[in-house]
Amino acid sequence: MPNWGGGKKCGVCQKTVYFAEEVQCEGNSFHKSCFLCMVCKKNLDSTTVAVHGEEIYCKSCYGKKYGPKGYGYGQGAGTLSMDKGESLGIKHEEAPGHRPTTNPNASKFAQKIGGSERCPRCSQAVYAAEKVIGAGKSWHKSCFRCAKCGKGLESTTLADKDGEIYCKGCYAKNFGPKGFGFGQGAGALVHSE
């Protein structure tokens, strides 16, 4: 059939689209009334349209049909849909059933993740409100002291050896270099035999 009016053809109904009712998208023309999602039939505009070949979709239906698969995809932030997409021709695969863990140290893992960690000094549970981390372990604030002199420590002012924590002074005296001038402070010269 000849195109006497010279207008463009609608990408949906293939009828002539006149200027007053034309919506353009990716080089194609549509009637305003035909510019609808091919699945849910919602009205579209330049901010809500998603194009796949010659087909137009709202972003939600496009995401369900062509985006990542799984619960929560294609809806937008903060939503979870149980729609598996059968209406879009998506085949659903059943997930394998739950199998119990084969980890022999499952109780240690559960203790770290599900329960509370234990303080290395007193072996009691350490909860978030009283936790201080030092030497890679969680301590009670009251237990976070030098093992020799009992001085309170900061995570930046400690030294650790064999699972215990020390202030820098006690660590230097007990585990540092031995000999003239070591471990006594500035200006001291001590002979040790």
From Swiss-Prot:
Presence of keyword Phosphoprotein: yes
Alphabetic keyword roster: Acetylation, Isopeptide bond, LIM domain, Metal-binding, Nucleus, Phosphoprotein, Repeat, Ubl conjugation, Zinc
Pfam annotation, one family: LIM
Motif, Nuclear localization signal: chain positions: 64-69
Localization per record: Nucleus
Residues where Phosphoserine is found: 81, 192
Sequence intervals crossing the membrane: none
GO biological process: muscle tissue development; nervous system development; sarcomere organization
Covalent crosslink: Glycyl lysine isopeptide (Lys-Gly) (interchain with G-Cter in SUMO2): 91
Modified residues (N6-acetyllysine): 84, 112, 131, 137, 161
CDD domains documented for this protein: LIM1_CRP1 (cd09479), LIM2_CRP (cd09403)
Domain of life the protein comes from: Eukaryota
PROSITE patterns: LIM_DOMAIN_1 (PS00478), LIM_DOMAIN_2 (PS50023)
Assembly behavior: Interacts with ASCC1; ASCC2 and TRIP4.
Record-given protein name: Cysteine and glycine-rich protein 1
The organism of origin for this protein: Rattus norvegicus (Rat)
